[in-house]
């Protein structure tokens, strides 16, 4: 009997040790263009409308990163950085016109080789056939909100319903399948919402009808002292279209006029045509009376801008409501399946977004609203609930973090840093003191010039190198980045010091893609294609 007892003791101890070392599941719940200031837990200017109660609960259960940034504020490149753990110039995907090289080393391949059951559902935006996944179904390109097509290993399929719901349905089935297999899983649940054009679920079409969305303080920014900002094409005033972006004045039969119309108008028709007659009936019933009132009002000037902002912001936030609800659905599934306690849940988005800030929509710039991206992580038993982190982190860190969480080997050529020490409350002494940024997509949509730059905990230096223009901001005294201090003689030594830091980062990351300043003739030609505002053309500062 004693012999049997001594034989069983090490077996029990081994079982307990194995249980402790059980690999955690990882859920990466990812959205498109969700600005941190459109999440209640970030305490931004939209908090009063309570846009994300479920994401806020996730933050209460885990850690919220207040200084989370992207390396290149545009959809495809941001996703490529996350997959590869390398800056755009290293992974080869610098703008949305590129195609991702799936043959390269990416973290899902490493996790799969380590025994993880892996899946990718929703928006990939990297082109090509996803690799490193046991299961996948992705939207072609940007994808559609209603009855979207999905690319799968079996071919192209039309999926009836609303995209955010559909992608979450796939994720839920994968979780149940993984449990049955008894394997740890890594799930990338990647939503189209709230990307342009903003089409909410039918159940949310009347959400916010009874309130006015607060306006950002910079809605009527005049871009003084910021020359590049004067030459963009992303203003709510001049570049947000009533048809394409706001879905007004669509003909009852959805017939496209024979006379050619701008592509921005056709897109609205194409989106609406995906709806079933039943879906379209509900949509028209919700928006018809509002559109009629808008036409009768005949708004102009600032009144028109304010109306467009309200329609845009409400549809944007309505799209986010679908994301918020589906996050709750997936978390409930984890609870119901008994998996929540061993599942790391990560919420993020590919970059930030302008929700009327500086009078804009879209992203791309190194200014705070598009540079910042949300990052919230729940890790039961590891992260202190309700904690907030102010260290400088980037999407460059995600690949290493996921590998570290799983106990997998981290390749030496990845360029980020694992966030696991920060999640455990142990900041390394050598943690970065600045982040590096580089945007490439020019000339292109919205006409945001190429630029690179550095951001420290207080200062930001931006180099619009093809135009030979620099900007410098003190984020402590000027958080809205309205005053360019680059030419201020009192800041000369400080700027030179930070410029040296920028060069050091650029060289350290091996970025040799910064181009020389272009000839004046080229600069003039490029900016002649944009609707330049002169001082006299700025909207007057009137109430």
Question: Language-model segments: which ranges?
Answer:
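Residues forming the ATP-binding cleft of Hanks-type serine/threonine protein kinase domains
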Residues: 476
């Amino acid at each position: 009997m004693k012999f049997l007892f001594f034989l069983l003791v090490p077996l029990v101890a081994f079982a307990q040790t194995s249980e402790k070392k059980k690999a955690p599941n990882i859920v990466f719940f990812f959205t498109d263009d969700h600005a941190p200031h459109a999440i209640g837990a970030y305490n931004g200017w939209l908090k009063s409308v309570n846009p994300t109660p479920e994401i806020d609960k996730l933050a209460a259960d885990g850690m919220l990163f207040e200084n989370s940034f992207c390396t290149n504020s545009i959809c495809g490149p941001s996703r490529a950085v996350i997959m590869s753990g390398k800056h755009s110039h290293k992974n080869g995907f610098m703008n949305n016109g590129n195609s991702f090289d799936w043959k390269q080393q990416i973290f899902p391949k490493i996790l799969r080789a380590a025994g993880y059951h892996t899946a990718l559902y929703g928006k990939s935006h990297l082109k090509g056939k996803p690799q490193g996944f046991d299961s996948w179904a992705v939207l072609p390109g940007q994808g559609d909100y209603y009855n979207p097509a999905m690319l799968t290993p079996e071919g192209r399929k039309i999926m009836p319903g609303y995209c955010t719901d559909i992608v979450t349905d796939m994720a839920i089935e994968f979780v149940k399948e993984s449990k049955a297999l008894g394997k740890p899983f890594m799930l990338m649940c990647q939503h189209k919402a709230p990307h342009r054009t903003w089409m909410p679920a039918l159940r949310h079409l009347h959400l916010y009808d009874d309130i006015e969305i607060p306006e950002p303080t910079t809605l009527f920014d005049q871009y003084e002292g910021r020359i590049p900002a004067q030459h963009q094409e992303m203003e709510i005033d001049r570049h947000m279209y009533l048809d394409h972006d706001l879905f007004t004045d669509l003909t009852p039969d959805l017939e496209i006029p024979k006379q050619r119309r701008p592509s921005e108008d056709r897109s609205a028709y194409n989106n609406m045509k995906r709806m079933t007659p039943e879906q379209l009936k509900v949509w028209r019933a919700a928006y018809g009376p509002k559109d009629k009132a808008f036409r009768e009002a005949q708004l102009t000037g600032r009144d028109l801008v304010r109306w467009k902002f309200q329609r845009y912001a409400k549809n944007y936030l309505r799209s986010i409501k679908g994301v918020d609800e589906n996050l709750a659905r997936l978390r409930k599934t984890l609870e119901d399946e008994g998996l929540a306690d061993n599942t790391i849940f990560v919420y993020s988005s590919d970059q930030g977004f302008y929700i009327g800030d500086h009078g804009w929509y879209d992203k791309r710039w190194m200014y705070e609203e598009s540079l910042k991206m949300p990052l919230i992580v729940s890790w039961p038993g590891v992260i202190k609930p309700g904690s907030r982190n102010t260290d400088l982190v980037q999407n460059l860190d995600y690949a290493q973090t996921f590998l570290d969480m799983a106990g997998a080997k981290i390749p030496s050529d990845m360029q980020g840093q694992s966030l696991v020490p920060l999640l455990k409350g142990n900041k390394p002494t050598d943690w970065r003191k600045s982040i590096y940024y580089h945007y490439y997509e020019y000339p292109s949509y919205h006409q945001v010039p190429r630029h690179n730059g550095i951001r420290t905990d207080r200062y930001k230096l931006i180099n619009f190198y093809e135009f030979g223009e620099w900007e410098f901001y003190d984020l402590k005294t000027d958080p809205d980045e309205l005053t360019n201090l680059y030419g201020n003689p009192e800041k000369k030594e400080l700027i030179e010091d930070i410029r040296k830091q920028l060069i050091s980062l650029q060289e350290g990351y091996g970025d040799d893609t910064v181009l020389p300043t272009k000839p004046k003739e080229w600069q003039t030609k490029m900016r002649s294609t944009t609707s330049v505002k002169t001082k006299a053309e700025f909207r007057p500062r009137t109430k």
